């Protein structure tokens, strides 16, 4: 399973990328707005930190604008993935991007039917929003399982990128449900390293080692 970081915070990205565990990055207009920086500059800097896919979202809602913005974003770096909303216009743009060899991440997916259309349009990634579905009383993980079954039935190449991840349990459940990737907020990514029994066990080992008076070096 590939793990992407959902952030535009370059300092945080550098820190976590140093672990060698970050396979890519996703961004969105909300994260760009919070950064207070120029979008193209942020995307270019992120692409210089990670070699994997970096999703950058178009702001337009009509096909013409999405195509123009997507082409400009794709020109920033070879690892840019153009992120488009799962709308009729977005899927028309996705088909054109596919024909042009531009990778796409179709976002805001809330149903398996939508995911089917995105795959038929040639999307590189589909982003089902797990946490937001849970907020509305649905089971976000059920959606991943449904998409996985459909994609496997018809040998679609589109990868399932679990989004709107809120907890480390979401990451585990998405992996079990067959997601190819998950995009994770920095705080949740940090939480993946931790378990109270790991810390407790480490402290015990260190205490026992100290009693030996030995040094490995």
From Swiss-Prot:
Keyword terms, alphabetized: Cytoplasm, Pentose shunt, Schiff base, Transferase
Catalytic residues (positions): 83 (schiff-base intermediate with substrate)
Keyword Membrane found: no
PROSITE patterns found in the cross-reference section: TRANSALDOLASE_1 (PS01054), TRANSALDOLASE_2 (PS00958)
InterPro entries on file: Aldolase_TIM, TAL/FSA, Transaldolase_3B, Transaldolase_3B/F6P_aldolase, Transaldolase_AS, TSA/FSA_arc/bac
Keyword RNA-binding carried by entry: no
GO cellular component: cytoplasm
Top-tier EC class: transferase
Enzyme Commission code(s) on record: 2.2.1.2
Major place of residence: cytoplasm
Reactions catalysed: D-sedoheptulose 7-phosphate + D-glyceraldehyde 3-phosphate = D-erythrose 4-phosphate + beta-D-fructose 6-phosphate
Subcellular location: Cytoplasm
HAMAP family: Transaldolase_3b
Protein purpose: Transaldolase is important for the balance of metabolites in the pentose-phosphate pathway.
Stored PANTHER family: FRUCTOSE-6-PHOSPHATE ALDOLASE 1-RELATED, TRANSALDOLASE
Family to which the UniProt record says this protein belongs: Belongs to the transaldolase family. Type 3B subfamily.
Full protein name: Probable transaldolase
Gene symbol of the encoding locus: tal
